[in-house]
Curated annotation (Swiss-Prot):
Topology of the protein relative to the lipid bilayer: Multi-pass membrane protein
Segments crossing the lipid bilayer: 67-87, 101-121, 145-165, 200-220, 231-251, 284-304
Cytoplasmic side: 1-66, 122-144, 221-230, 305-332
Protein name, per record: Aquaporin-7-1
Motif window: NPA 1: 127-129
Catalysed reaction equations from the record: H2O(in) = H2O(out)
Length: 332
């Protein structure tokens, strides 16, 4: 019809033609109301700086747990030693404030509190000797060992610094002046052996006590051997340390832990106690509270895994295959 224009939809051989029409009808740019809704639904974007901080926190979380665990250990342990010994001076306190049992309880409480703080995050080693033993016998990654040990020693330094700052005036009175520092107060933070102890006896005492500690730690974390729940493990360690202090603690002040001795000793060296800290008994600081505990922990782990442990994650494997495993092996 010439006077009318009739619009008819012609089929197109191009399959994209309909698509292009739909695209024109529904543009990609959302309406303003739709865009506002999307903004509310989108999660807030974090700045790159905050993301970096979160990454750093995640990377150092386990070592920091070890740091705080050892710091608490020193605060309770060295703090109790300071209170007991310094109070024997009548110019510091009117009466004695405690006994060896008080010091023993202080260290036991310190190990329990340190384990509670760090146990669920880093495993609660708070001891380089235990960290190395766990890497040897329980598959703890060796790549994490250096960061753990560094954090543990640093925790010992900071813990000793806090206790020293708290008792500095009492230490001044006890020593006779601000610039007088002797073994009498150094022994409140670092370990020293009794005068009659020979070098071999000192080494053996620390070796034996740490071997017992290591064996008990492996037993307390062995699910096949009636291990306590995670919440009760620190209490078990508390009881263990009371026993170790009461039985093996007198002669060398039972370091059992390189970070417990070396960390505070480093702080004392920075606080004016001099070279005597490291010259005492031909480098006693190295072979008694560091080497002996490390070797003792290895010996304790070796004994436990050789004669008692029945798990699969030890280099010493004694577990017999079950009947099902034997049948599977025969089929294969």
């Amino acid at each position: 019809m010439s006077g009318q224009h009739q619009i008819t939809e012609q089929p197109s051989g191009n399959p994209l033609s309909r698509t292009s029409t739909l695209i024109q009808e529904k543009p990609l740019t959302p309406t303003s109301s739709h865009a506002e809704t999307q903004k509310h639904l989108e999660a807030p974007r974090q700045s790159s700086f905050l993301i970096q901080l979160q990454d750093i926190r995640h990377a150092i979380r386990m070592p920091m747990a070890e740091f705080f665990g050892v710091a608490l250990l020193i605060i309770f342990g060295a703090g109790s030693a300071c209170q007991v010994v310094l109070s024997t001076n009548p110019n510091v306190a009117s009466s004695d404030r405690g006994s060896f049992l008080s010091i023993n309880l202080g260290w036991a409480i310190g190990i329990a509190m340190g384990a509670w703080v760090s146990g669920g995050i880093s495993g609660g080693h708070i001891n380089p000797a235990i960290t190395i033993a766990m890497a040897t016998y329980r598959g703890f990654p060796w790549r994490r060992v250096p960061s753990y040990i560094f954090a543990q020693v640093l925790g010992g330094v900071v813990g000793a610094a806090l206790v020293y700052a708290n008792y500095i005036h009492a230490i001044d009175i006890f020593e006779g002046g601000r610039h007088v520092r002797t073994q009498a107060t150094a022994s409140l933070f670092a370990t020293y052996a009794l005068p009659y102890m020979t070098q071999v006896s000192c080494f053996f005492s620390e070796f034996l006590a740490t071997a017992v500690l290591s064996m008990m730690v492996l037993a307390l974390t062995d699910n096949r051997n009636g291990a306590p729940t995670n919440g009760l493990l620190p209490f078990a360690l508390f009881v263990l340390f009371i026993g170790l202090g009461a039985s093996l603690g007198m002669e060398t002040a039972y370091a059992l832990n390189p970070a417990r001795d070396f960390g505070p000793r480093l702080f004392l060296a920075m606080s004016g106690y001099g070279k005597a800290l490291f010259n005492y008994r031909s480098q006693y600081w190295l072979w008694a509270p560091i080497i002996a505990p490390v070797l003792g922990a290895q010996a304790g782990g070796l004994l436990y895994d050789t004669f008692l442990y029945d798990g699969d994650n030890s280099p010493i494997k004694w577990r017999r295959a079950s009947s099902q495993e034997c049948q599977l092996a025969e089929v294969v």
